[in-house]
């Protein structure tokens, strides 16, 4: 399989250094001479309002205990879910809390092929980043026969993978947090991405792919360092997302104080879950008996 990223990232191609440094992908973002979002990614990434459909009009019927607690307003925020490390299995939970502020953007759509006896089977792989630009970011990857189906699936997976982003200060703690709290490193394949705190006003000094993820995470100032085969956009984005998700994986002196945990929502609202539980009956059809002579 020949990846189209190599063709787009050459010195003379649309992703070359002479055309704004698009980072080797055709349908994403950047400030090249050919405009914004040429190729397969054209017209996408404008937020939830640009991709309306019948799915949003349907009433959400939760199928998990967490979904029932969220819909019944027993859980007030996403942070309560993250505090107890409860797995989120329904994308509607994210829409319930962050729906109005969520923005998504297609990073890349690439064809992948599988050799079969009938020939080559081509499918499309979509990379989608999603975030609210205020401390929550997610990354989804989906492969499907059709581009639209791959994008929809990647958006759902990105919502399910949303993580909280911890932000901090470079020097004096004045104003709102604006950068990563300390140096963090993420890895995927051969790609290693390091995020380094930066002074206020520096901006995000990075390639286009990490820059988009950091912006969606709500980080305003950050230095980055990357090594490995960063032309592989999927690994580059996953390594950046891994680094961002590690901002809450270590303790700092302000977190040394003993934390008094309350009961898990499943324990606290056990009676409510029992009352609202509806048993789903599955009708099993028995195959007709075959008469033998």
From Swiss-Prot:
The modification N-acetylalanine is found at residue 2. Residues 1-55 are annotated as: Disordered. Residues 34-52 are annotated as: 9 X 2 AA tandem repeats of R-G. Residues 7-34 have a biased composition (Gly residues). Keywords: Acetylation, Citrullination, Cytoplasm, Isopeptide bond, Nucleus, Phosphoprotein, Repeat, Ribonucleoprotein, Ribosomal protein, Ubl conjugation. There is a cross-link at residue 275 (Glycyl lysine isopeptide (Lys-Gly) (interchain with G-Cter in SUMO2)). This is Small ribosomal subunit protein uS5. It comes from Rattus norvegicus.
């Amino acid at each position: 399989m020949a990846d189209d990223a190599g063709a787009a990232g050459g010195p003379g191609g649309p992703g070359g250094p002479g055309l704004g440094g698009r980072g080797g992908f055709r349908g994403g973002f950047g400030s090249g001479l050919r405009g914004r979002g040429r190729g397969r990614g054209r017209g996408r990434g404008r937020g939830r309002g640009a991709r309306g459909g019948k799915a949003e009009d349907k009433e959400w019927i939760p199928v998990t205990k967490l979904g029932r607690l969220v819909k019944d307003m027993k859980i007030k925020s996403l942070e309560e879910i993250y505090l107890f490390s409860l797995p989120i299995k329904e994308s509607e939970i994210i829409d319930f809390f962050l729906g109005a502020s969520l923005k998504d953007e297609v990073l890349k759509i690439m064809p992948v092929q599988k050799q079969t006896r009938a020939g080559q089977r081509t499918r499309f792989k979509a990379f989608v980043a999603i975030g609210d630009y205020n401390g929550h970011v997610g990354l989804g990857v989906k492969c499907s026969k059709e581009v639209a189906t791959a994008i929809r699936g990647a958006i759902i997976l990105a919502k399910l993978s949303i993580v909280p982003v911890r932000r901090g200060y470079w020097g004096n703690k004045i104003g709102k947090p604006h950068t990563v709290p300390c140096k963090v490193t993420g890895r995927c394949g051969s790609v290693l991405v390091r995020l380094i705190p930066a002074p206020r006003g520096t901006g995000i000094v990075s390639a286009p792919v990490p820059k988009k993820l950091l912006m969606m995470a709500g980080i305003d100032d950050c230095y980055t360092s990357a090594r490995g085969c960063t032309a592989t956009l999927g690994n580059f984005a996953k390594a950046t997302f891994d680094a961002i998700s590690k901002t809450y994986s270590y303790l700092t002196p302000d977190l040394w104080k003993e934390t008094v945990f309350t009961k898990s929502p499943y324990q606290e609202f056990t009676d409510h879950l029992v009352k609202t539980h509806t048993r789903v009956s599955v009708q099993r059809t028995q195959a007709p008996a075959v008469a033998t002579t």
